[in-house]
């Protein structure tokens, strides 16, 4: 079998596969985040074929799905998929605030699109300079091109002015930076 690293102080036994660093599980998670079939992601050849082989990947993906079904376990992505499937049950909302929007995956953007139709006001906050989850399927370009009124904060309240000024030096050298 595949040894899975896990860490969850509340329920290790049922969540061990969610926080692993195994390349098979990472690829399965990325396919879910990208909202594509695992075979499609495999065929993109973005992985090391010496490490990940189609046979075991297909088996692990189907076994994981069955394991979660039998044990009535849902991970975060399963919750998102359930909301998408049952969108007619989502009530009308006054406002929604989504932070770190630069790190949303296509699956999460699909839910955002549904929530837009269910709310009066939607606020997205994020910083494309801080997009760090492309490896997991995050779609920073969707964040950048999302229509709406854009407010760019010129000053950070998280770091000192001196640190901010120094960080602007390398950022300003990047072509196409906003």
What residues fall within each predicted segment?
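Accessory N-terminal region flanking or inserted into the helicase ATPase core
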Residues: 3-97, 106-111, 134
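Conserved helicase motor core of SF1/SF2 NTP-dependent helicases
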Residues: 95, 102-178
């Amino acid at each position: 079998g595949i040894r899975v690293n896990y860490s969850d102080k509340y329920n290790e036994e049922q969540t061990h596969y969610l926080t692993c660093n195994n390349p098979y599980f990472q690829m399965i998670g990325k396919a879910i985040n990208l909202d594509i079939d695992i075979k499609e992601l495999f065929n993109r050849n973005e992985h090391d074929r010496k490490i990940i082989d189609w046979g075991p990947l297909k088996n692990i993906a189907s076994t994981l799905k069955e394991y979660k079904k039998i044990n009535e376990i849902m991970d975060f992505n399963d919750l998102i998929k359930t909301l998408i499937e049952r969108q007619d049950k989502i009530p009308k909302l006054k406002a929604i605030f989504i932070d770190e929007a630069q790190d949303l995956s296509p699956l999460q953007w699909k839910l955002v699109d549904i929530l837009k139709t269910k709310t009066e006001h939607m606020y997205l906050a994020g910083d494309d300079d801080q997009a760090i989850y492309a490896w997991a399927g995050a779609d920073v370009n969707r964040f950048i091109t999302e229509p709406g009124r854009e407010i760019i904060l010129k000053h950070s309240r998280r770091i000192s002015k001196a640190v901010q000024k120094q960080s602007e030096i390398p950022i300003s050298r990047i072509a196409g930076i906003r």
